[in-house]
Structures are given as C-alpha cells and as structure tokens.
From Swiss-Prot:
Changing R209K: In spt-2; affected carpel fusion and abolished transmitting tract production. SMART domains: HLH. It comes from Arabidopsis thaliana (Mouse-ear cress). Keywords: Developmental protein, DNA-binding, Nucleus, Transcription, Transcription regulation. This is Transcription factor SPATULA. It is found in: Nucleus. Gene3D superfamilies: Helix-loop-helix DNA-binding domain. The keyword Transcription applies. Induction: Down-regulated by the A class gene AP2 in the first whorl and by ARF3/ETT in gynoecium. The lineage of its organism: Eukaryota, Viridiplantae, Streptophyta, Embryophyta, Tracheophyta.
Length: 373
C-alpha cells in the first residue's frame, strides 16, 4: 500500500513538473539556478524528475550528425549548452557523473512508458519552447538539447528542400539551355533544307540539258557517214568537214550542168521574169535556125548568171577566173548565112570551153576531184 501511494505521488509530481516545464517562459534561468543549487545542495526529488524528463526528451529526439559522442554521453546533452567557455558546464558534468542514482530515479525508469504517454507529442512543442540557439554566447543556455535538435532537423529539412529546389532549378536551366540550341538550330536547318532543294533543282536541270545535248549530237552523228567518234569536239569537226564537202559538191554540180538545173534553189539569186524566160530550156522545134538562136541567147546570158552565182557562193578568185564569156567563132549574121554549118562549130566550142574550165578547176584544187569521185 505504501509503495502504491508513493508511486501515485511520484506520478502526480511528474505531471506537475511537466506542466511547470511547459508553462514556464524563463526556463533557461531556472535551469541555471538549479545547476548552481546542485553545486551546493543535494538534489531533491523534483530535480531528479526534471532530469529524468530531460533524459527522456534526449532519447526521443534523434541526434544531429554534427554532435560528437562526448556531448551525447555527458550531461551537456541533457542541459543542451552551446559554447565551450561556460564554467557551469564543467561543474554540471562532474556533478552528474559522480552523483549516484537514487531509488526514486530507478522507480521513475519503471514508469517511463507512462511518462512518455503523458508527454507524447508535446515533446516537440516543449523542445521548441525550451530550445533556442546560442552559438558562441556563454550567457545563453538552452533548457533542452532536443530544441536544438528539432531546429537542426528543421534546418536540415529546409536544406533538403533548398537542395531539391536547386536541383529543380538546375534541371530547368538545363532544359532552357537545351531549348536554346534547338531554337538556334531551327533557322540553320531551314537554310540547309533550302540549299538542298536548290541543289536538287539545279542537278535536275543540268541532267535535262545534258540529255538534250546528247540527243542532238546523236542525231548529228547519224547524218555524218562513217562517223565513229564519240567525243563532242571530234564529232563537230567531222560535221564541219562534211558540210564543206557538200558545198564543194554543189558548186561542181552547178558548173557541170549549168544554171538550168535548179535556178530557183540557189541561195542569194533573185531572177527577174525576163531572165527566167531566157533561162527556160528551148522548145523542140523543127527549125534549126530558131534552135540555134535560142541556144545563143542562153549562152550569152550564162556568164552573167555564173558571175552572180559565184559572187553569191563567194568562190575563190581562181574559180572565178575560169568563168568567162564563151568564145564565139562567128557573128549572128554569118551564122544565118552559113546555116547549119555554124551550129556544130558552136556546140564544139561550147563543149571545149566547158572541158577546159573543168580541167582548170581540177588543176587548181586537186583535192576537190578526189572528194567528188
């Protein structure tokens, strides 16, 4: 019975002590006076209860990383003193380390669970009430180290939050940096695509032009006989030589057959109706005199037509020298008197003149004879 009463009294004292700790605003000064009182007087039961509660607070709250093991094992962790120059801290350490535990403390440990239930969530608020930062100041003393631990944990949480924010900001910055080159690469990609399209169009036009040129060269090669060249320069040379040969052949044909072959097809010749009537071949009649006069008229107009043809074709002087007036053996009056005797002479002279002209032309240009043959 007596033990039960003592336990009840101790519980009441603990509850009262908790209420006093929570309601007191100047806990640091109270703890300082209690520490000084412990130096001269033996500890009372209320002081032991308060120490026990502090010890429970210390166990309930996690220790930060920057606390050393020496501070956790000594009584400085119970009192929560910051700073190295406090003389009361050394005295309290020596006092608590040499103070033997009493029976009330042992009994209070047995009912620690009940005290923890009573204190519960109020430890954080009590720690917030008692704990305050006093780094470097010898006069400022914390009532409970849990306050500093809670504050340090809050600081750690805030530090983690800032780290997360920094990480997010860095990620956002990287995203912005990644977007910036993409925005810069946009115009460059457009310009490169435009250049590629222009190059493709140019290549297609070049292919079409080359295909047309090849087709024309093939057509030209088909017109030239015995053409075996493949390059364009040699094919053009052969075409030029072939055209020169054709011009010479046309000139020789005009010289052999006279102007009566195709007078209207010659380039650069404009013939009047009178000349056309003179150039027309004579009609076959029974009168030899009319036939002779028609031939004489045609031969008298022949040198003028030959000169015009030679000038139109721009013949060489050596060729022009051979085109002269045909020699007339007799006059028209003598021809009319002699009758049919002069007709064969005229024909013979005309044929001789043609032969001598062709021989002189071949003597001046021997290559022309080979090409024609």
């Amino acid at each position: 019975m007596i033990s039960q009463r003592e336990e009840r009294e101790e519980k009441k004292q603990r509850v009262m002590g908790d209420k006093k700790l929570i309601s007191s605003s100047s806990s640091s000064s109270v703890y300082d006076t209690r520490i000084n009182h412990h130096l001269h007087h033996p500890p009372s039961s209320s002081d032991e209860i308060s120490q026990f509660l502090r010890h429970i607070f210390d166990r309930s709250s996690p220790l930060p990383s920057y606390y050393s093991p020496a501070t956790t094992t000594t009584t400085a962790s119970l009192i929560g003193v910051h700073g190295s120059g406090d003389p009361h801290a050394d005295n309290s350490r020596s006092l608590v380390s040499h103070h033997p535990p009493s029976d009330s403390v042992l009994m209070s440990k047995r009912v620690g669970d009940f005290s923890e239930v009573l204190i519960g969530g109020g430890s954080g608020s009590a720690a917030a009430c008692f704990g305050f930062s006093g780094g470097g100041n010898n006069n400022n003393v914390q009532g409970n180290s849990s306050g500093t631990r809670v504050s340090s944990s809050s600081v750690g949480a805030s530090g983690n939050e800032t780290d997360e924010y920094d990480c997010e900001s860095e990620e956002g910055g990287e995203a912005v940096v990644d977007e910036a080159p993409s925005s810069k690469s946009g115009p460059s990609s457009r310009s490169s695509s435009k250049r590629c399209r222009a190059a493709e169009v140019h290549n297609l036009s070049e292919k079409r032009r080359r295909s047309r040129i090849n087709e024309k060269m093939k057509a030209l090669q088909s017109l030239i006989p015995n053409s075996n060249k493949t390059d364009k320069a040699s094919m053009l040379d052969e075409a030029i030589e072939y055209l020169k040969q054709l011009q010479l052949q046309v000139q020789m044909l005009t010289m052999r057959n006279g102007i009566n072959l195709h007078p209207l097809c010659l380039p650069g010749t404009t013939l009047h109706p009178l000349q056309l009537s003179q150039i027309r071949p004579p009609e076959a009649t029974n009168d030899p005199l009319l036939n002779h006069t028609n031939q004489f008229a045609s031969t008298s107009n022949a040198p003028e037509m030959i000169n015009t043809v030679a000038s139109s074709y721009a013949l060489e002087p050596s060729i022009r020298s051979h085109f002269g007036p045909f020699p007339l053996l007799t006059s028209p009056v003598e021809m009319s008197r002699e009758g049919g005797l002069t007709h064969p002479r005229l024909n013979i002279g005309h044929s001789n003149a043609n032969i001598t002209g062709e021989q002189a032309l071949f003597d001046g240009q021997p290559d022309l004879k080979d090409r024609i043959t």
